[in-house]
Amino acid sequence: MPIITLPDGSKKVFEKSVTILEIAQSIGAGLAKATIAGKVNDVLLDATIPINSDSKVVIITSKDKEGIEIIRHSFAHLIGHAVKQIYSDIKMAIGPVIEDGFYYDIFSEYRFTPEDLIKIENRINKLIKTNYDVEILQVSKKEAIKTFKERDETFKLRIIEDIPEEGLINLYKHEEYIDMCRGPHVPNTRHLRHFKLLKLSGSYWRGNSENESLQRIYGTAWAKEKELNDYLKRIEEAEKRDHRKLGKKHSLFHIQEESPGMIFWHPNGWTIYQVLEKYIREILKKNDYLEIKTPQAVDKSLWEKSGHWEKFRDDMFTTASENRTYAIKPMNCPCHIQVFNQGLKSYKDLPIRLAEFGSCHRNEPSGALHGLMRVRNFTQDDAHIFCTEEQIQEEVSTFIDLVFEVYKTFGFDEIIIKLSTRPKKKVGSEEIWDKSEEALTKALDNKNLKWELQPGEGAFYGPKIEFSLKDCLNRVWQCGTIQVDFSMPIRLDATYVDIDNEKRNPVMLHRAILGSFERFIGILIEQYEAKFPIWLAPYQLTLLSITDRNIEKCLKFNELLINNGYRSTVDIRNEKIGYKIREATLERVPLIAVIGDKEEEIDSVSLRALDGRNLGIFNLPNLCKLMDGLIEKRGRTE
């Protein structure tokens, strides 16, 4: 007689084994109809599996986070059901849930097209309308092998090979189609309604390019039609803002096959990069950082000593010279310790903050590369703070202020903060972990910040705080971080002399605000849709001549503006002024200044903003004053 305890503390007693669906039915028919699965003693369980003992039960519906993930996973199986009905010689690989959706990797000699996506989607809709029950079969490993051998599902058989002999394997039966999964899944297809197949891409079995080439079908699914439509609108907007398209359209950068994952910056894009670097450099100087520059290629012996050679060797680019192996640095920290180690340091010298715009290289898989967002060569706004244990909290607190100041400058007000604490495998004493975690916690709490704890997610050498931005499309980008490190100063012999004249190892704080310049610029391109605020824009103002008579005045104004430090350009082509204004607008120039006979007479310009607002008549001093004010605000609205 299982006693079931519900979330409100109430108990229900059943005379025999009971399923989640039966528990829901005992509460009400409406709840039973909405039930997708359940959580039994904090473990997700299919709605139709019997519960035999006293348990705490939570009923899962589409309103729950777990419910929508189950819906998405069930849709992945529906892809399998549909393609197996439509195409021959299809072999199913894996079909997991991902953020906002799902995908299925499929092996087929036939190459799917966008037209096939429509065909598959139509078949899925047809299957859904039959409202069939999804049966769960819990079988032994031997029986699972037999099932998939009969169906010639070679990839499923490979997955089964890695499953232990003991225990049962969950098979899910969609009419004639059978798939394998940890589960749970929906009990009936009536729970599967609002979905869209999105795109096709290539992949490899288990992500290894030496394995079979697969075809991936992506989809999304939501509990409500409005949620689906809102998501599709966000995708459409994201495609419109895609930094790769805008980068090409506005001549910001390009990437080519001869140098995959490495950026060719064009003058417009490089201007943005330089302005961003200048801004961060100002911030660093204001906060007492010392800027350094370290070598690109370093003998592997340093990487062996730091531990990176053992852990990251496959991700490093290497070269050889005079019988020595060098690694092109994937990170800056070991080199920064070499700078710290030059000369004797006293506790009175700490904290020492060393910063570098460090160019790093990592041998990312070619399939993972994505425009500016995932590259092989990137520049970090990297810094390392060498301090005592007692100084951790103050340094972290100051850094948090710095992060919020910078992000606010770019219009990011919603910052997600996560604190990751000690993992099972770690270096350092429990005492120093206690001190460090307490310091990070206090630094956050003293600022009344909302943050999320991630127990056990810290690095083996220390706890960390991560800062993520939420952009205009509600996408989350992890950019900033501050990481406590007890290990590397010891490994690389970094020491200072304490108050008792004893040598001690400093604590090292790894920290970055932007993460990488490339990725952050990619985020900004999409956030602004290439409509950069005036301080960041490649060209801040363009001067347009109405007739040939006004060309000389345009050129003179332009020269004066450039000599005063503004990024100005001219359009003196023999075109109609309306056409020139449209061109300047399409080029996203923040300020458009028109000079005709009337303006020339009074030595002024007619000024308009990118959004079409008429700003009035400005002579050169007033124009400079206006631009200075806008540039000083750096896009801030307050």
Curated annotation (Swiss-Prot):
One of its GO terms (molecular function) is tRNA binding. Residues 1-61 form the TGS domain. Zn(2+) binds at C333, H384, H510. The keyword Ubl conjugation does not apply. Its EC number is 6.1.1.3. The keyword 4Fe-4S does not apply. Its main location: cytoplasm. Keywords: Aminoacyl-tRNA synthetase, ATP-binding, Cytoplasm, Ligase, Metal-binding, Nucleotide-binding, Protein biosynthesis, RNA-binding, tRNA-binding, Zinc. PROSITE patterns: AA_TRNA_LIGASE_II, TGS. GO terms for biological process: threonyl-tRNA aminoacylation. This is Threonine--tRNA ligase. It comes from Prochlorococcus marinus (strain MIT 9215). The lineage of its organism: Bacteria, Bacillati, Cyanobacteriota, Cyanophyceae, Synechococcales.
